[in-house]
Amino acid sequence: NTELTPPPAEIRNLMKAFEDNGYQILVVGGAVRDLILGLEPKDYDLATNAKPDEVKEVVDGVKGYRYVLGPQAEKSVLNLTSLVTIPNEKEAIEITTFRKELGYAGGRTKGVFEPADTFDEDAERRDLTINAMGMTADGKVIDPQGGLEDLQNGVIRAVGDPTQRFVEDPLRMIRAIRFSVRFGLPIDKETYQAIVSNADLVSTLSGRRLRDEIGKVLVEPNGYQLLMETGILPVLMPEFRNMEQYQHKLDYHPEGSLYNHYIEAFKEFTKIPNRTELGAWALLFHDIAKPQTAEWNEEGGYHTFYG
């Protein structure tokens, strides 16, 4: 019976309108997780058993709120997601109909959805248990997948069968790593092993999705290291395979191997308070060509890297 700080009044008023019309509606996803962790949510996403046309009907009846129409909204309706503008907010919020996934097209790049009747069904399709919680307008947590317990125990766990989750959408593996390093929580053993076993699947993802997610990992402490240990980065960039075998001259690099050099470089980078994803990408690429230029110096016992 955990209770959290209720959402802002503008969100509560909208949720009340749905409840008054006989629908269930919840705050879902990251906002619930962040509130449990004592963090300020960046935004509030809602989920309901109302279908998009029913969402529009409810929203049209609430003064000051507007159901967003147009190409962007029509595209969203295909995903059972409605966009609604609310008073005093610049960004529209998303109200998604409870949904279940029937399969994927193009290596998840697009899910095929149908409406679900309950939040329990909706939660089954989410990536991680900590992102599969809901919250009522008065702050009561709804937790069908045990995300609250996992947060309290300090563990990142996939919803259901981790292999199935990652085959459905390989980006979920990188998201699991991101939340692990962001919150300093270890990944559950079964979930971690599923990432290692399925790391090759990330090669099916689009460059844009990879860029957005990996950049968020690299700016966090241990992010680079976990991408390497799980095999994700070597799959995406073969230059990062076998970096341990390349040895620097210790006079210049007392950390020794090229692998250790990157670990130490990212360790220092993540101490910078205002570090950026662009800076992380620059650091990632700064020595990427060394394996291709390496020559062994037999006398000195180290590699040289003359391009």
Set out the residue ranges of the language-model regions.
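Catalytic cores of the polymerase beta-like nucleotidyltransferase superfamily
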Residues: 1-307
